[in-house]
Amino acid sequence: MDILTSTKGYEAYLRIELGREVVDEGLTEKRSEMRAGPFPFLRATYWRWTEIVLELAPELASAPKVLAVGDIHLENFGTWRDADGRLVWGVNDYDEAAEMPYALDLLRLATSGLLAGAEHKAEAIAEAILDGYAQGLEDPGPAVLDRKLAWLREAVMVPEGHRQEFWDKLKRKRKKFEVRTEAERPKLWPRYEAALRATLPPGSDEPRIWYRSAGVGSLGRPRWVAQAQWCGDWVVREAKAVVPSAWTRVHEAGGRSIRCIEIATGRYRAPDPWYRVIDGVAVRRLSPNNRKIETDKPLSREAEDGPEETLGRDVLLGRPMLEAMGRELASIHLATKDAGEDVRRDFAARGRAWLAKGAAVAAERIAAEQAEFAATPEVP
């Protein structure tokens, strides 16, 4: 099956799962992202990864199975506050979580690194991820930043001057939505409004709700934002549709269960208490204090002599960050009951060469499919 047929098939699947809720303008935007380059293509097409990954790396099919992230990549990490208000960093999108060979998360993360930074060597990316994964297998746990990991805390803390940008961006998107006629707007279906209202603090004022375009892989699924006054200032919640993982669609393993909450609240996590799934809708808190590093955007950080900027890609592909990502994946995987010893044994026996080799093969295939897709103006 080629990429055009695959894309058409997945969009048909979404329409079966979501029916009239599918946002057509979101699918159009996703196709545009797919044409933009290999890294956004990877982010947009997790379903395609599930179709081809065991063809590219058949030796990984025998690796022990865990509840894995699935759609993991460099930009699927961010910060939140846990139930005690501590700043935590880690994987922050679990839409495609499913049971699969643990090594596939490592392969996809390394592949994303190659596609995001062509000048970086597969061996260096793989070594850092594998070192971090080994550390996580030895000592799993969440990355709580209040007292430890000062370098990571410095990287993800939002500079004072940038907090207003969060509110300005929300306002721009709300106004852009509100000037559209009712007929032009995506429809607010009742379950999204109900989920948003259910997760706002009791006593909040009447919220303003609007459609939000964000992310890449989830484009085409409804995504809505509610903003309300509460105790003197704004609170914001975001709701988006979740459907059974694309992995289970292809491999028919694990049924149709949506396992976002299970993986987000695993044994070695310090979970976001505002993250919930209600009636097939994932809801999270949005805040100017939370941050995700993006590959192609400058990352501003506070320094002694004032703010300094680094390209996000350079931070994400640095050895310390890749190690932290690997460690985080191990901590997530070890939450799977009785999987720990099997994973540790397989990881030790598998050696090191497989990841760099596999990532190079996968990156080459993804780049070729992206070029093929980009050369076709429209999906038939």
Predicted regions and their residues:
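Conserved ATP-binding subdomain of kinase catalytic cores across diverse folds
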Residues: 1-26, 32-69, 74-159, 197-380
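Sequence-structural signature of the catalytic-core scaffold of metal-dependent phosphohydrolases
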Residues: 137-192
